[in-house]
Amino acid sequence: MRGVLIAAMVALVVSLLGTPWVIRFFRRQGYGQEIREDGPSSHLTKRGTPTMGGTVIIVATLVGYFLAHLVTGIGFTASGLLVLLVMTGLGIVGFLDDYIKIRKQRSLGLTARMKFTGQAAVALAFGLLAVRFKNHAGLLPGSTYISIVRDTSLTVGIIGFPLLAWIIIAATSNAVNLTDGLDGLAAGTSAMVFGAYVVISFWQFGNLCEPGDSPAGCYAVRDPLDVALVAAAAMGACFGFLWWNASPAKIFMGDTGSLALGGAFASIAIVSRTELLLVVLGGLFVIETLSVMIQVAFFKATKKRVFNMAPIHHHFELAEWPETTVIIRFWIVSGLAVAFGLGLFYAEFLSHGNG
C-alpha cells in the first residue's frame, strides 16, 4: 500500500509542478493547438493554447512508478512494465501526430494509415510479449481467455490474442481521443477510471490465488500490486495535469495524452482480466464513441444528422449549454459509470460465497 501511495503522490507533484514549466516552454516554441473551423465558434478563442501536455502525464507516471519502486525496494514486474510500454508507445504516436499539426498549422496530423500503423505496432508488440514471462505460479501477464471480471471459458487462442489486444488497445485509445474535446473532460474522466483500477488491482492483490491455496473467489492474475501502482501513478498524474487543464485550459493534453491514457486503460484491463468491465468503467468513453458511429452511419444512410455535432459533447455545446456545464455533467456520468463498474466487480466477488 505504501508504494501505491508514493506512486500517486510523486506523480501528482511532478505533474502539478511540471506542467507550468511545460506551458512556458511550449509557448516559447510556438507549440499551440490548431482548432477545427467547423467546430463550435467558442473554441476559436482556444487557438494557440499549448498542446502536447500529455508528455507531462506520461513522464509523471513513469517518475511516480519508478521512484515508488526505488523507495520501497519492490522489484519490477512484467505486467507493470508492459502497461508502461503501451502507454509510452502510444504517447509517442500521439506526439508525432501533435507535432505535425503544429508544424503544418492544421487540425489534422498523421494520416489515418500512419496512425493506424503506429497503434497496431504498439498493440501487437504488447500482445506478443504479454503471453510470455510466466511467474512462479505459471501465470502470464495476458490471457488468451476473454475476461469480464475474471477470465471466462471463451478463448481466442495464442494466435488470436495479439489481435484481441490490438482491437482493445486501438478502440480504447481512439475512444479517449474522441472524448478529449473539452477542457478537463478527458483528464478528469481518466483520473476516475484509473482510481477504479487502483481499487480493483489492490483488491485482487489482497485476494490472490496462490499455488496450493485457492480460496473461493480468489483472482488468478499476475502482478496485481504493481498494476495498482501504475494505475495510482497515472491517476496522480491526471489530477496534477487537470489543475492546469481545467476550464479555461492553460494547456491541452493533445493526442500525446489521449492515446497514451487509452493505451494504459486497455493494457491494465487486459492484465487485470477485466476487459469487458472496462466498457462499464469507461462508460463515458463508450458514449462518446457511439455518438460518432451513430452520426456517421445515419448521415451516410439518410444524409441527415442525429446530433448537432459529434462527439456528443459538441452537440450539447451547440445546444447552448455552457462548456463547464457539459464537462461537470459528463464527469457525473463518468462517476456513476465507475461506481456501477466497481459495484459489479464486488458483486461478482460476493457471488463466490464471500459475503
UniProtKB/Swiss-Prot annotation:
<dbReference type="InterPro" id="IPR018480">
    <property type="entry name" value="PNAcMuramoyl-5peptid_Trfase_CS"/>
</dbReference>
<feature type="transmembrane region" description="Helical">
    <location>
        <begin position="224"/>
        <end position="244"/>
    </location>
</feature>
<keyword id="KW-0573">Peptidoglycan synthesis</keyword>
<protein>
    <recommendedName>
        <fullName>Phospho-N-acetylmuramoyl-pentapeptide-transferase</fullName>
        <ecNumber>2.7.8.13</ecNumber>
    </recommendedName>
</protein>
<dbReference type="GO" id="GO:0008360">
    <property type="term" value="P:regulation of cell shape"/>
</dbReference>
<dbReference type="GO" id="GO:0046872">
    <property type="term" value="F:metal ion binding"/>
</dbReference>
<feature type="transmembrane region" description="Helical">
    <location>
        <begin position="120"/>
        <end position="140"/>
    </location>
</feature>
<dbReference type="InterPro" id="IPR003524">
    <property type="entry name" value="PNAcMuramoyl-5peptid_Trfase"/>
</dbReference>
<feature type="transmembrane region" description="Helical">
    <location>
        <begin position="80"/>
        <end position="100"/>
    </location>
</feature>
<feature type="transmembrane region" description="Helical">
    <location>
        <begin position="185"/>
        <end position="205"/>
    </location>
</feature>
<feature type="transmembrane region" description="Helical">
    <location>
        <begin position="276"/>
        <end position="296"/>
    </location>
</feature>
<dbReference type="GO" id="GO:0051301">
    <property type="term" value="P:cell division"/>
</dbReference>
<dbReference type="Pfam" id="PF00953">
    <property type="entry name" value="Glycos_transf_4"/>
</dbReference>
<dbReference type="GO" id="GO:0005886">
    <property type="term" value="C:plasma membrane"/>
</dbReference>
<feature type="transmembrane region" description="Helical">
    <location>
        <begin position="3"/>
        <end position="23"/>
    </location>
</feature>
<keyword id="KW-0132">Cell division</keyword>
<feature type="transmembrane region" description="Helical">
    <location>
        <begin position="152"/>
        <end position="172"/>
    </location>
</feature>
<dbReference type="GO" id="GO:0009252">
    <property type="term" value="P:peptidoglycan biosynthetic process"/>
</dbReference>
<feature type="transmembrane region" description="Helical">
    <location>
        <begin position="330"/>
        <end position="350"/>
    </location>
</feature>
<dbReference type="Pfam" id="PF10555">
    <property type="entry name" value="MraY_sig1"/>
</dbReference>
<comment type="pathway">
    <text>Cell wall biogenesis; peptidoglycan biosynthesis.</text>
</comment>
<keyword id="KW-1133">Transmembrane helix</keyword>
<keyword id="KW-0460">Magnesium</keyword>
<keyword id="KW-0479">Metal-binding</keyword>
<keyword id="KW-0808">Transferase</keyword>
<keyword id="KW-0131">Cell cycle</keyword>
<feature type="transmembrane region" description="Helical">
    <location>
        <begin position="56"/>
        <end position="76"/>
    </location>
</feature>
<dbReference type="InterPro" id="IPR000715">
    <property type="entry name" value="Glycosyl_transferase_4"/>
</dbReference>
<keyword id="KW-0472">Membrane</keyword>
<dbReference type="GO" id="GO:0051992">
    <property type="term" value="F:UDP-N-acetylmuramoyl-L-alanyl-D-glutamyl-meso-2,6-diaminopimelyl-D-alanyl-D-alanine:undecaprenyl-phosphate transferase activity"/>
</dbReference>
<keyword id="KW-1003">Cell membrane</keyword>
<feature type="transmembrane region" description="Helical">
    <location>
        <begin position="251"/>
        <end position="271"/>
    </location>
</feature>
<dbReference type="GO" id="GO:0071555">
    <property type="term" value="P:cell wall organization"/>
</dbReference>
<dbReference type="GO" id="GO:0008963">
    <property type="term" value="F:phospho-N-acetylmuramoyl-pentapeptide-transferase activity"/>
</dbReference>
<keyword id="KW-0961">Cell wall biogenesis/degradation</keyword>
<keyword id="KW-0133">Cell shape</keyword>
<keyword id="KW-0812">Transmembrane</keyword>
<comment type="function">
    <text>Catalyzes the initial step of the lipid cycle reactions in the biosynthesis of the cell wall peptidoglycan: transfers peptidoglycan precursor phospho-MurNAc-pentapeptide from UDP-MurNAc-pentapeptide onto the lipid carrier undecaprenyl phosphate, yielding undecaprenyl-pyrophosphoryl-MurNAc-pentapeptide, known as lipid I.</text>
</comment>
<comment type="similarity">
    <text>Belongs to the glycosyltransferase 4 family. MraY subfamily.</text>
</comment>
